[in-house]
UniProtKB/Swiss-Prot annotation:
Entry keywords, A to Z: FAD, Flavoprotein, Oxidoreductase
Organism: Dictyostelium discoideum
Protein name: Probable flavin-containing monoamine oxidase B
First and last residue of the signal peptide: none
InterPro entries linked: Amino_oxidase, FAD/NAD-bd_sf, Flavin_amine_oxidase, Flavin_MAO
Modified residues (S-8alpha-FAD cysteine): 406
Keyword Oxidoreductase applies: yes
Disulfide-bond pairs as recorded: none
Length: 471
């Protein structure tokens, strides 16, 4: 009898980040009875906008790229405005073995890797592009010899095998900046899969109005979640960590029972899980997941990043002709960006400490030691005013229980992509899968999260039409 009373949802979505909330948003517009269960005490997942005075800073994901149609359309629908990331002026390059620090204008028509002394990278990129032409990333196959061979090598190993050992330092930096993992911690196949999902290398190397970090949302990226939550109203709940998903037979159909850590039970016909792969190990599934999905949850890892936000009382770097962007092989900040709000109510620079070993090293230091190292690095680039911020903020995403890191799930060398990747989005009974890690487009980005939600909504709508099972 209890089952009859509680069986009142078409679909329950686990996770109140961008993919989960947009899944709920689209299903509710189609008159589905839905519920979002979020484990945290806030919505937004790996986006988190923090109020600072009259403005904000984004402690999590914050950028839209030019080729992010789904996210841009959603912002338009939610009446959210965007503004351009500030790139006018010189970028600092701290990448030279002799310790010299140079600056270049990336908007110059003549700017390229050769100008900054990295011309030796161009042949490697061309070689990688040739390799990518022979891979069908839409069908990661255990029958593909090239995929199997590439996946057995880390990025560093592949470079050395191919005779590009002198470029390991650059690609180690590149991997940290793009997927928050070192070139020793991910397979070359995973890196190529990621690069393919964002339409190639070019937009990662040079920052301009067409790059992957071209636009920001006024009010912060969390505004997307806030607007959707205001639409969903009581159809989303916080502090509901899911511990059990049990598919049971009921009246000749499959009923799903969801149990949370506070012993609440919910019943529905469909579940959408947006939990990152490596966190699925915290949930009991009945019946158990197929072996391929079990391998994904047990073997995938999350990238590691500390996002550092330094707030100042002036935009002194702009006044000196700099754009706040830096690229460093030295650290502790390996990449930084101007992080000012559109109205300059908050004047700040964000920086990233990325990679497993880097996080381990810098988090063994005190907060004051990290702060001092970051400010001293910035003072080398933009002068003594960098030593006197009005606020210093850190977010170590590796310490976040419900993210376990950032920016995205990554794959080490082995065979997990070629053996298991095609299984990740396949429904398990009436359990469907979304989240940026399930997206073949803009993997790891906010756009990837929205794209995955579009896919899973189409799955559920199609199933509903076939079975006429909507409540």
């Amino acid at each position: 009898m209890e089952m009859e009373i509680l069986y009142n949802y078409d679909t329950i979505i686990i996770g109140g980040g961008l993919s989960g909330l947009n899944t709920a948003y689209d299903l509710k517009k189609s008159n589905f009875k839905i519920l979002v269960l979020e484990a945290r005490n806030r919505f937004g997942g790996r986006t988190d906008s923090v109020k600072v005075g009259d403005g904000w800073v984004d402690a999590g994901g914050q950028w839209l790229g030019t080729n992010n149609p789904n996210l841009k359309q959603l912002c338009k629908e939610l009446k959210l405005e965007t503004y351009k990331q500030f790139y006018q002026g010189k970028t600092v390059f701290d990448i030279y073995d002799d310790g010299l620090i140079k600056s270049f204008d990336e908007s110059s028509p003549n700017f390229d890797l050769c100008e900054i002394g990295l011309g030796n990278i161009n042949p490697i990129i061309r070689a990688i592009k040739e390799v990518m032409k022979n891979i069908d990333f839409s069908k990661c196959s255990k029958e593909s010899p090239i995929m199997l061979s590439l996946e057995k090598l880390t990025v560093s190993e592949w470079l050395r095998v191919c005779g590009y050992g002198e470029s390991v330092k650059f690609f180690n930096w590149f991997c940290k900046m793009s997927v928050a993992s070192s070139s020793d911690d991910i397979s070359i196949l995973f890196l190529l899969k990621y690069v393919n999902s964002i339409n190639g290398f070019e937009s990662l190397f040079i920052s301009d109005d067409d790059c992957t970090e071209s636009d920001r949302i006024i009010g912060g990226s969390s505004m997307v979640s806030e607007r959707i939550v205001s639409y969903l109203k009581d159809d989303c709940k916080l502090n509901c960590e899911v511990t059990l998903i049990d598919q049971i037979s009921h009246k000749n159909s499959r009923l799903i029972k969801i149990t949370t850590s506070n012993n609440e039970n919910y019943y529905c016909r469909n579940v959408v899980s947006t939990i990152p792969p490596m966190l699925l190990k915290n949930v009991i599934f009945k019946p158990d997941l197929p072996i391929e999905k079990q391998r994904l949850k047990n073997e995938m890892e999350m990238g590691n990043t500390i996002k550092v936000i330094v707030i100042y009382d002036s935009v002194f770097w702009r006044d000196q002709g700099y754009n706040g962007k830096s690229q460093s092989f030295v650290g502790p900040i390996y990449q930084s960006f101007d992080n000012c709000t559109n109205d300059l109510s908050v004047k700040s620079i964000i920086g990233f400490i990325n990679g497993k070993e880097e996080i381990k090293y810098w988090y063994s230091k005190s907060l004051e030691e990290r702060r001092s190292a970051v400010l001293n690095q910035y003072s080398k680039y933009w002068g003594p005013k960098a030593l006197n911020p009005i606020h210093y903020i850190e977010r170590n995403w590796s310490l976040d229980k419900y993210s376990a890191g950032c920016f995205m799930g990554v794959c080490k060398s082995g065979d997990i992509i070629s053996q298991c990747n095609n299984y990740y989005t396949q429904p398990h009974g009436n359990i469907h899968w979304a989240g940026t890690e399930t997206s073949t487009q803009w993997y790891g980005h906010m756009e990837g999260a929205i794209t995955s939600s579009k896919r899973v909504v189409n799955e559920i709508l199609k199933n509903s039409l076939n079975s006429k099972s909507k409540l």
